[in-house]
């Protein structure tokens, strides 16, 4: 069975993304990120998704990656807890921004996990 997405939750890029986490000590250029982000939105629209654009969060350089603090599955969302201290607080903000999209909201209160740590295959999560 295939799940058909109807909505995309996307955050506008912020200028502080240049200070985001990087394993290679890279500093992305805001102008390039903005152009790539516009193309990303166009691609989502071309496949028929409704774009739900969230405002920038300058105090959180990596907040453009909305999949890290929130894992969505059908009508459910789990607000996650990223390990890096620079991301503490993103979950509290995104839960307020997206709660109206979901029937059920759950929270990771102990331990650390972010969306990039989780793989969904059919109805199974690893």
Annotated model-derived regions:
Residues 1-126:
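The feature marks the mature, well-folded catalytic cores of soluble enzymes
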């Amino acid at each position: 069975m295939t799940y058909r997405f109807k909505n995309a939750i996307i955050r506008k890029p912020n200028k502080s993304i240049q200070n985001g986490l990087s394993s290679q000590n890279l500093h992305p250029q805001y102008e390039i990120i903005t152009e790539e982000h516009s193309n990303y939105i166009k691609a989502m629209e071309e496949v028929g998704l409704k774009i739900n654009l969230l405002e920038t969060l300058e105090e959180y350089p990596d907040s453009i990656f909305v999949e890290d603090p929130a894992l969505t599955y059908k009508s459910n969302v789990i607000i996650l807890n990223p390990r890096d201290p620079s991301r503490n607080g993103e979950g509290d903000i995104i839960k307020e921004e997206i709660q109206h999209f979901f029937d059920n909201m759950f929270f990771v209160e102990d331990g650390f996990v972010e969306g990039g740590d989780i793989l969904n295959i059919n109805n199974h999560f690893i």
